[in-house]
């Protein structure tokens, strides 16, 4: 089972709100997911991003691949840096 860390769209028309979820790559965008690890609100000013670092690092360590947008959010919040540091420590 290929696992991805990706965005799940929520919210009303023209007012998107995204949850950052871990899901099977074959599942639909807004379908079943394994675990929610955060959220992203692009409408608010400034844009809100909340990611549970521990859960994200756990899933990255088990081989989950983030999508391009999620990878940018992980880099901006320092999760990728922490993940790389944990890999170096082992």
Swiss-Prot record:
The family database entries (PROSITE patterns) matched by this protein are listed as:
RIBOSOMAL_S16
- GO MF, one annotated term: structural constituent of ribosome
For whether the record's keyword set contains Disulfide bond, the answer is no
Q: Name one GO biological process term.
A: translation
Q: Which InterPro entries match?
A: Ribosomal_bS16, Ribosomal_bS16_CS, Ribosomal_bS16_dom_sf
A Pfam family this protein belongs to?
Ribosomal_S16
* One GO cellular component, as annotated: cytoplasm
Superkingdom per UniProt: Bacteria
User: Keyword set for this entry?
Assistant: Ribonucleoprotein, Ribosomal protein
As for family, the record states: Belongs to the bacterial ribosomal protein bS16 family.
The name this protein carries in UniProt is Small ribosomal subunit protein bS16
What organism does the record attribute this protein to?
A: Clostridioides difficile (strain 630)
């Amino acid at each position: 089972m290929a696992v991805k860390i990706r965005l799940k769209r929520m919210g009303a028309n023209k007012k998107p709100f995204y949850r950052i979820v871990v899901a099977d790559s074959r599942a639909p965008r807004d379908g079943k997911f394994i675990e929610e690890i955060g959220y992203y609100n692009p409408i608010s000013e400034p844009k809100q991003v909340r990611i549970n670092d521990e859960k994200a690092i756990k899933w990255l360590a088990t081989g989950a691949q983030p999508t391009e947008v999620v990878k940018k959010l992980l880099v901006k919040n320092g999760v990728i840096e922490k993940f790389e540091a944990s890999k170096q420590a082992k």
